[in-house]
Regions:
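Transmembrane helical elements of multi-pass membrane transporters/channels
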Residues: 35-54, 156, 167, 190, ...
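Short alpha-helical transmembrane segments in multi-pass integral membrane proteins
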Residues: 1-37, 95-160, 204-260, 316-381, ...
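Helix-terminus/linker motif at the lipid-water interface of multi-pass membrane proteins
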Residues: 49-68, 137-144, 200-207, 267-296, ...
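Hydrophobic transmembrane alpha-helices of multi-pass small-molecule transporters
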Residues: 79-82, 194-198, 224-228, 300-303, ...
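Residue-level signal for transmembrane alpha-helical positions in Major Facilitator Superfamily
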Residues: 34, 38, 50, 87, ...
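Small-residue-rich hydrophobic transmembrane alpha-helices
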Residues: 55, 67-127, 164-183, 277, ...
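Residue-level signal for short hydrophobic patches within transmembrane helices
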Residues: 26, 30-49, 53, 76-83, ...
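Short runs within selected transmembrane alpha-helices of multi-pass transporters and secretion channels
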Residues: 88, 157-175, 183-194, 212-227, ...
């Protein structure tokens, strides 16, 4: 059926139930950017909140070793899933571009190809995780007192990868048409399931890290079921039919062109963080646990930046498809402003009240000391990540995914590895190890911003 525009909303014709889709091509922008980004931010923050509750349950009702085992896996998990999560971003951009071009005939092929890729990538990660869990933790130098627990958690965690990928790709499809609410609702439900299962498995059944892993798998299954249901009951051309799952070569090519550079960037970025985690491991279990505690709050702040970065990807994607330079410029400015202010305020709030927030996770003085250092050195400057996330998001929306990928790999990955191999090897100091984060953010942000302005001038000249 024909889709038409009414009062800034995409709707099907009056013979069917109205489907609310945000019109990113016309009208005011600030309110729409906020309406799009806030559910995204809430989605990620709620997910992290639920994960933090699970981590706190492990720390309070299991042991410091169990807490360290769970915390030591965050960079490994990120390393192994970011490539495929980046590919899901490719489906978002491709669909957004088609919407901007008003080409609804090719959208169904992208939708069904994306879900097929989600299934294949999830199964691949499930199998890979079982084989590499222990070797990669050994390579990272995980302490002997936690390595067996960390391996167990990681192997259980990856059992849920097919469901995680189905949610990730499905949510990306919905966001491409302006729907950020239903992915949020799905995560709220799965987050509640995660907390309940954590309490059941860890507190009642005393399963420790195994219980935490099983709770995460249960939550992933819950979110995947919901997102697939939403897509199967969506209106054309987004509606999913399991019988129509396919691998369309043209769609795969376009998705991978955008998604692979973004995924590789995230993968190399995560690899650098794995190396930094190895440096953290060298300070012992207290440093690992303290860093894990701070990371919970660091994620909260970063997810605000990431929400606005995802927002500008979709908004820029549609408006670049429509060749609207004025709106593309405004999208960049508003996205950057919202990202810096929101992340900066939340980060400073956490830093000011750090004693209370750290105390929610641990009473161990040694763990507390390391957590405070990371709060002060890293979280204070978290808003700097906006510089490369927002500009890079706009470039991806323009279909130029390789440029921000290369620059971010150099600025935030190569530099960190050089820092580890030189400064941190000369001076075994936790503060110097943490300092690489704000330093790399400044360098990366400067390079990606320059690339954004140069690319935009060329595209619209």
């Amino acid at each position: 059926m024909k889709i038409y525009r009414k009062d800034g909303i995409y709707m099907k014709n009056s013979s069917s139930k109205a489907s609310m889709k945000m019109d990113m091509l016309h009208g005011s922008l600030l309110d729409k950017i906020l309406l799009f980004a806030m559910p995204l931010a809430a989605c990620s923050i709620l997910q992290q909140l639920f994960n933090s509750v699970g981590t706190a349950v492990v720390g309070r009702f299991a042991s410091s070793e169990a807490l360290a085992a769970v915390g030591s896996n965050s960079s490994v998990i990120s390393l192994m899933v970011t490539l495929f999560s980046g590919i899901s971003l490719g489906s978002n951009v491709v669909i957004a571009n088609y919407i901007g071009q008003q080409d609804t005939k090719r959208i169904p092929r992208v939708v069904h190809t994306a879900i097929s890729l989600a299934l294949l990538s999830g199964i691949f990660l499930l199998i890979l995780g079982q084989f590499v869990a222990h070797p990669i933790l050994v390579l990272m130098g995980a302490p002997k007192d936690i390595i067996n627990l960390a391996t167990l958690y990681l192997r259980i965690y990856f059992l849920g990868m097919p469901f995680f990928m189905l949610y990730d790709f499905g949510a990306s499809i919905l966001r491409s048409i302006g729907d950020t609410r239903r992915p949020m609702y799905a995560l709220i439900v799965s987050g509640v399931v995660n907390v309940i299962l954590n309490l059941l498995f860890v507190v009642v059944f005393h399963l420790g890290v195994a219980g935490a892993g099983l709770a995460t798998v249960g939550a992933n299954i819950t979110s995947a079921i919901q997102i697939i249901y939403f897509l199967m009951h969506e209106e054309l051309p987004i509606r999913l039919s399991l019988k129509s799952l396919m691998i369309d070569r043209d769609s795969v090519s376009k998705i991978l062109k955008i998604g692979v550079p973004a995924g590789l960037q995230g993968m190399v970025f995560s690899l650098a963080n794995v190396c930094i985690q190895s440096g953290i491991n060298s300070f012992g279990s207290a440093a690992i646990a303290g860093s894990a505690v701070e990371l919970n709050y660091e994620y909260f702040s970063y997810y605000l930046v990431n929400a606005f970065a995802q927002t500008v990807v979709t908004f820029a994607g549609q408006n670049y498809g429509a060749k609207d330079e004025v709106r593309c410029k405004k999208i960049f400015r508003l996205g950057m402003l919202c990202s810096v202010i929101s992340c900066g305020v939340l980060s400073l709030f956490f830093v000011i009240f750090r004693t209370f927030f750290i105390g929610l996770f641990t009473n161990d003085p040694a763990v507390y000391r390391y957590a405070v250092l990371r709060f002060l050195i890293v979280l204070t400057f978290e808003a700097l990540t906006s510089s490369y996330e927002i500009s890079g998001g706009c470039l991806r929306g323009f279909g130029r995914s390789m440029t921000p990928a290369i620059l971010t790999v150099f600025g935030s990955c190569v530099l960190r590895l050089i820092w580890l191999a030189t400064v941190c090897s000369w001076f075994h100091d936790y503060k110097l190890l943490m300092a690489i984060y704000p330093i790399s953010w400044v360098l990366t942000g400067t390079m990606v911003l320059i690339a954004y302005f140069r690319t935009r001038r060329k595209l619209f000249c």
